[in-house]
Amino acid sequence: MNLEGTSGGILQKEFWRNRIQYNQSQKDILQSWFQHDPFPDKAAREQLAKEIGVPESNIQVWFKNYRVKQRKLDYKCFSEKDQTQGHDQSQHLTQEYLPKEARQKQTFITWTQKNRLVQAFERNPFPDIATRKKLAEQTGLQESRIQMWFQKQRSLYLKKSRMEPMNLLVDDPNERPDATVGWHPINLFLPTDSSHYFSCSHSSSGHETLPPVLPSTQAPWDPFRFHVSQGPNVMIMQPTQAVQEGEKSDQPLIIPNHLLTLPILTKDLDTPTPFWLQYQEEHQNHKEHSGSGVPQVKSHSQPEPEHREQQPLNLGQFDISNILQRWDEICQALLAEWDPLKGTH
C-alpha cells in the first residue's frame, strides 16, 4: 500500500521530518514523568513541553512509543526467565484467571491425604471449621476442598447404609430376597399340639396347603377380623388368591410362613378343638335335628369330652370352593348369634 496517497503516510513523513533528538536531561524528565503517569493528559503534556522546550505533539508521540518499548522489554524479560520459574508463574496466572469450579476440579487428593481424611471422617463425620483448618494444615489442602470432600463422603456413606439391609437378606448373590425369606412348606397332616393345620386336595393339584388356624381369645369377637403375623419382607397370600394361582399352575402351591389367627370361642384353652373338626361335628348335628343348611353355634358352656382323641382329619372329600362356602356360612351364623352388649365372656 502506498503511504504517500494517504493521510497516515503524510503524517508519518511529517513526523520523520520534524523528528527531534532528545538530550539526556530531556529524556530523564520524560522518563521520570512516565514512571509517575504513563498516560498524561493534554494539560500535563503542555506543561512538559514548556519545561523541555518541545512541542506538545512530539511529547505525545514520545509517550506512545515509550509505552510500546516498555511492553516489549517486559515480554522479553519474562521469556528469558528460568523455565521452571516461568512454568510456575504461568501456572499461577492460569489458576488466577480460571473460574472457581475449574480450580476445584484440578485439585486432586493423594493417597496419603485421603488416608488422613478417612481417619478423621471415622472419628467425626461432621467436623467444624477449626478441625477442617487443622486438617488443611496437615494435608496441604484448602479448607473448602476438605469441606467438599466430607460432604461427598457423607452422601456416599448414606447410600451405602441404605444398600446394606438388602444385601443382608441374601446369602447367595444369585438369589432374590423375596424368594428366600419366609417361604416354607406346611405339613399335610394335623399335629396334636396347639397349632392345628388343615389341608385340602383339589382336582387340579394335590399339593395345595392352607395356613394354620389358631384360637384367639385376646381380642373381642369379630367374625370378619383376623390377624396375620409374619416376618419381614414376606408376601401375604389370601386363600382365594392361593386357589386362583394354584389352578393356573401345575407346580405345588406353597403358602408363605405366616399365621392366620381366627377367633374361636372355646372354654378349654389347654386342649382346643380344631376348627374344622368342630365345624364338621356341628354341621352333622344340625342336619340331623333341623335339616337346614345353616350351622348353629355350639354352646361353649358345655365342656369337651376329655377321652376324645384328636385324629388327623382327612379332608380329601372337601373341595376348595366348598370349604370357602362353609366358612362364609359359619361367619354369617356366628354374626347372627353375636350380641355386642353381652360381649364374649
Curated annotation (Swiss-Prot):
Pfam families: Homeodomain. Gene3D superfamilies: Homeodomain-like. This is Double homeobox protein B. SUPFAM superfamilies: Homeodomain-like. It comes from Homo sapiens. GO terms for biological process: regulation of transcription by RNA polymerase II. Keywords: DNA-binding, Homeobox, Nucleus, Repeat. GO terms for cellular component: nucleoplasm; nucleus. Residues 282-314 are annotated as: Disordered. Signal peptide: none annotated.
